[in-house]
Amino acid sequence: ETKFVGVLVNPSDEELKVYSRLNLDYFQIYGNYDNKKIIEIKAKYKKKIILSLQIKNKKDILNYKNVKDTADIILWDSSGLEQSVSWEYDWIKSAPDNITKMIAGNIDIDKLEIISKLADIVDVSGALETDKVKDLYKIKKFLEKVKELND
């Protein structure tokens, strides 16, 4: 099933209003948000929330505790944003299984099997680019690997 996601970095209320008019299923939000703000955004704009937590060190993984009751999906991402920086994906094991986990941050085909066992969702956008442009060869290889893992 395909879901449409708007990726927003520290969006203003006006930006959220504009994006809420699009046929998006989720707002993927980067920034410092607490439960109160997430509840407000969900109620006002009728969107599910993927909240991104930037990972610089192992203790950053635990920041999910602040938003686990309101964010629909917790995304653990590198602190590099669009730079596709890796982090120790095993750190996510400290998060409970009852939350929907998403991982991003320099995920390439060689890491897919390991990551698929740690997270429910994998964000691979930067890993499938060459010079900041989607690379059809990388996408094809990635999809072949996904099919192999699912067979």
Whereabouts are the PLM-identified features?
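Conserved anion-binding
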Residues: 1-111
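Glycine-rich phosphate-binding active-site loops on the catalytic face of alpha/beta enzymes
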Residues: 29-34, 78-85, 118-140
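C-terminal helical cap(s) of enzyme catalytic domains, especially alpha/beta-barrels
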Residues: 39-44, 125-151
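Conserved alpha/beta-domain cores
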Residues: 109-114, 149
